[in-house]
Amino acid sequence: MKVLITGFDPFGGESINPALEAVKKLPNTISNAEIIKLEIPTVFKKSLEKIEANILAHKPDIVISIGQAGGRFGITPERVAINIDDARIEDNEKNQPIDLKVFEDGENAYFTTLPIKAMVKEMQESGIPSSVSNSAGTFVCNHVMYGVLYMINKKYPNIKGGFIHVPYIPSQVVSKPNMPSMSIEDISKGLELSVKAAVENNTDIKTAQGEIC
């Protein structure tokens, strides 16, 4: 089995992206699955082009993309991606799409095909804060999650795919009072446990991970 796991380069004025740094720290094998690590640009369209090129090159069974969500307290596997690009800031090539569809012929939304509740359980049982997220935003993270699931739906039905958001690391919040953070070691361990759950669970578990509002 092969798992393609991607991490974004730094964006939004940050000098580091914990998503990419945590991906780099992952072992090359998890639960007997080969781990293929890929840096992708925080750029609309180009990020998806790079992922698809690596899908074609490596033929992975699972694709997991990792992104930074500053302000979140834990590691949050995403439940759903929506067909909208609505960028509050420019990407790394100064693109700023507003109210545009990711793909004109795509569904309004695609749900993850990863066992996200099993992932959360693995992390929580190891003492790593984690919960299911019901919004991947409308920036490049959602763009990538939606785009990968669109490709899976249209071209690669045997691949499982989804997205995980991670918090800031401590060095990023020195000048951001009261902003939560997590060590890069805990983030990487959480991702390793998430990959383990994805490899070992063909279907998700039934646990309450919903939100009131």
Curated annotation (Swiss-Prot):
EC number from the UniProt entry: 3.4.19.3
Gene3D superfamilies: Peptidase C15, pyroglutamyl peptidase I-like
Database matches in CDD domains: Peptidase_C15
Entry GO CC: cytosol
Active site: E78, C141, H165
UniProt GO molecular function: pyroglutamyl-peptidase activity
Subcellular location: Cytoplasm
Main location class: cytoplasm
InterPro entries, sorted: Peptidase_C15 (IPR000816), Peptidase_C15-like (IPR016125), Peptidase_C15-like_sf (IPR036440), PGP-I_bact-type (IPR029762), PGPEP1_Cys_AS (IPR033694), PGPEP1_Glu_AS (IPR033693)
Any single Pfam family the record assigns to this protein: Peptidase_C15
Reaction(s) catalysed by this chain's protein: Release of an N-terminal pyroglutamyl group from a polypeptide, the second amino acid generally not being Pro
Domain of life from the UniProt record: Bacteria
Family listed: Belongs to the peptidase C15 family.
Functional note: Removes 5-oxoproline from various penultimate amino acid residues except L-proline.
Name of the featured protein: Pyrrolidone-carboxylate peptidase
